Amino acid sequence: MTDKFDANDETRTVYAVVYDNDQPVSTGQFLAETKIEARLTRIVTLADYCGCGYGAKVTEALETYTRREGFYQLTIHSELTAQTFYENLGYQTYGSKYLEDGEYCQSLVKTILKWEKNMDIAMLIAIVGGLLGCYLYLTKNN
């Protein structure tokens, strides 16, 4: 797996790694693209561990990080052999297939809902609305 690193790895990358005892068997990377968009990349599982659900666990861990950090959308640039895997995790294809490093690829996207933040905002609006209603009622009736 050490051949899966590049210049971005020192400063902009967050990793998820699944271990079997002391051996890393699946990994993936998170890269922030903008303040609201990020990309998952280099999600890989060793051949002997494929089909065990480790790739899904890595992806879900990175999605949790994405949500917690306030990002709205995730993209993945996937080889065609992994497209169905990502579709099963809720990703949707966009754009045309393209050739990259000798492999045909497809871009996929997933909206990451920020329930916690939306709920906090909704609660704040309800509280402010309630206080404003009480204020208006009291000033009108006094």
UniProtKB/Swiss-Prot annotation:
Major enzyme class: transferase
GO molecular function (one): acyltransferase activity, transferring groups other than amino-acyl groups
Keywords associated with the record: Acyltransferase, Transferase
Domain of life according to the entry: Bacteria
Pfam families assigned to the protein according to its UniProt record, in alphabetical order: Acetyltransf_10
Classification of source organism: Bacteria, Bacillati, Bacillota, Bacilli, Lactobacillales
Domain N-acetyltransferase: 1-120
SUPFAM superfamilies linked to this entry: Acyl-CoA N-acyltransferases (Nat)
Name of the protein in its database record: Uncharacterized acetyltransferase spyM18_1563
EC number: 2.3.1.-
PROSITE patterns per record: GNAT
Family indicated by similarity: Belongs to the acetyltransferase family.
